[in-house]
Amino acid sequence: MKRKIQDCLAYRLFLLLPLFSFGGCVEIKAPVDYVNPYMGNISHLLVPTYPTVHLPNSMLRIYPQREDYTSNKLKGLPVIVTSHRGNSAFSINPFNSFCDSLEKGSRSSFILYNYDNEKIKPYYYSVFLSDYDIEVKYVPSHQSALYQLDFRAGQPGLLIGATNGELHVEKNKVFGYQQIGSYETRVYLYLETDVVPLQTEEGNTVVMKFPENDKRINLRYGISFISVDQAKKNMEREVAGKDLETLTRTGRTIWNDALGKIQVKGNCEDSKTIFYTSLYRTYERMVCLSEDGQYYSAFDNQVHQD
């Protein structure tokens, strides 16, 4: 009798083992994993939310330059959004030798894309431009960022544009400014590619064409409200010499530290998604404008010490 009881207990324990095994494989989510940047991107009445990519309270932020979530056109790749609901200052249009409209100099061409090929996290953005066979990956820092562009076909090229401003190019470096609306405020750009272009043109739009055998172009840039030199310093301080994976890990850690200040208990995953997405939205404001101990004030158009 005792033997039968032992066998029965052993059998039941054997049946429970798979449950413990599967339970041990359950992924534990960090706070940033609950954030859904697409929540609210389609609005029935007011302006929708935008899937903003940035670090908490940072000066540099971007979101895809499209009409709405369902649009199939991008107004170039974004560089910096200068207001809560404004367009991006500057734009980057990657192209290859098969993109005829861009190749022939249409500076305002849209980029066709499919939102199913897009991935957005608070600290990361990627999109595959299937019509051009170009894969785009992006990660921001506080005042600078990195684009990794993989050209799977044709000769790689870039159009870098500024409306109401000017840009200059020296080998693999692009720098200049764009006026913000009708105000005296300027946003400055300093940009470097890790591949020296074969051919360049400058003006309101810079054209860069690269060797056909260089299929990956890493593009690092800094922005500033003070000067081009300060934009360069911001880039060198934050992203120079760092790759996409390193910056992605750093951004994820920063977001987890910020969102993790509030811990949520409960079994409702949807409620956690709503909470942490809402908390992520609050970090769009206020914005830290300090650049190496100084900041530009739009009230008097002067640079002040912190």
Q: Language-model segments: what does each one mean?
A:
Residues 1-2, 133:
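Short, charged low-complexity linear motifs
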Residues 2-13:
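Bacterial N-terminal signal peptides that target proteins for export
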Residues 11-14, 20-22:
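Aromatic (phenylalanine/tyrosine) cluster motif
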Residues 19-29:
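Bacterial Sec-dependent signal peptides at the C-terminal "C-region" and cleavage site
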Residues 28-306:
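Accessory carbohydrate-recognition regions in carbohydrate-active enzymes
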